[in-house]
């Protein structure tokens, strides 16, 4: 524990003469650990961080419009790779895994123990919009791998822009089952149950990128390093995310 504190302190104890005001784009489904990391970073450095949350596709479109900001944190490596291909990031790093799971409300789970049973049921499904959020593509791939893609697609009644929005639909009963993140399902495990995922279901990587547009590259690198530090990763795993392999 002392070693962990020492590592974190080394990352965060460099203070600027004038506090930096950083801008971070972050996937909406990552908000809980991000808020904890930002709070500690601000407390220990005196710098400030403004966070713009949204679906990973949404924040990518936003950045491509304004071309300003310091860091970009997405629920899937794909979005940061796109920025890398356009020379908008000069450093990227994987933090944890963002795993899609099929979560079913406990009051609707009776008789549903497989994707076959789900495909034959009358349950209403929700998934993420693959153009807007990281887990949307994972949901589509999960359906394909299940062998019941058409039947499952026919049951979709909503495609959400963020995983947070999708979780609300599930908890409010607007849908009976939804492909959400493992971390979100873990937090409401008293209300939902999970189906075993088909073999090959993609495990997205929560990835951070340091933007070339940063006005404070030194301080942005500091925050980048903290996200990837043992303490930063712990904030994510404490919320149900899985360590990167």
Curated annotation (Swiss-Prot):
Coiled coil: none
Localization per Swiss-Prot or TrEMBL: Periplasm
Family annotation (CDD domains): PBP2_ModA3_like (cd13517)
Protein name, UniProt field: Putative binding protein HI_1525
InterPro entries (UniProt xref): ModA, ModA/WtpA
GO terms for cellular component: outer membrane-bounded periplasmic space
Keyword annotations: Metal-binding, Periplasm, Signal, Transport
Pfam families per the UniProt record, alphabetical: SBP_bac_11 (PF13531)
GO molecular function: metal ion binding; molybdate ion binding
The UniProt record lists the keyword Signal: yes
Binding-site residues for molybdate, renumbered to this chain: 56, 163
Signal peptide span: 1-19
Family affiliation: Belongs to the bacterial solute-binding protein ModA family.
């Amino acid at each position: 524990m002392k070693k962990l504190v020492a590592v974190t302190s080394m990352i965060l104890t460099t203070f600027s003469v004038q506090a930096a005001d950083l801008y971070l784009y972050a996937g909406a489904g990552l908000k809980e650990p991000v808020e904890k990391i930002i709070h500690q970073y601000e407390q220990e450095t005196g710098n400030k961080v403004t966070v713009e949350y949204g679906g990973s596709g949404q924040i990518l479109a936003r950045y491509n419009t304004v071309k300003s900001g310091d860091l970009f944190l997405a629920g899937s490596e794909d979005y940061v790779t796109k920025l890398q291909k356009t020379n908008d990031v000069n450093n990227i790093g994987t933090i944890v895994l963002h795993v899609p799971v099929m979560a079913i409300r406990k009051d609707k789970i009776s008789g549903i123990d497989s994707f076959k049973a789900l495909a034959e049921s009358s349950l209403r499904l929700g998934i993420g919009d693959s153009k807007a959020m990281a887990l949307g593509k994972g949901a589509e791939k999960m359906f394909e791998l299940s062998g019941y893609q058409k039947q499952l697609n026919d049951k979709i009644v909503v495609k959400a822009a963020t995983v947070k929005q999708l979780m609300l639909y599930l908890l409010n009963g607007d849908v009976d089952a939804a492909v959400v993140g493992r971390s979100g399902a873990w937090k409401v495990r008293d209300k939902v149950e999970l189906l075993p995922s088909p073999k090959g279901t993609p495990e997205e990587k929560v990835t951070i990128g340091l933007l070339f547009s940063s006005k404070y590259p030194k301080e942005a690198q500091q925050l980048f390093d903290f996200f990837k530090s043992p303490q930063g990763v712990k904030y994510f795993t404490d919320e149900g995310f899985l360590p990167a392999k």
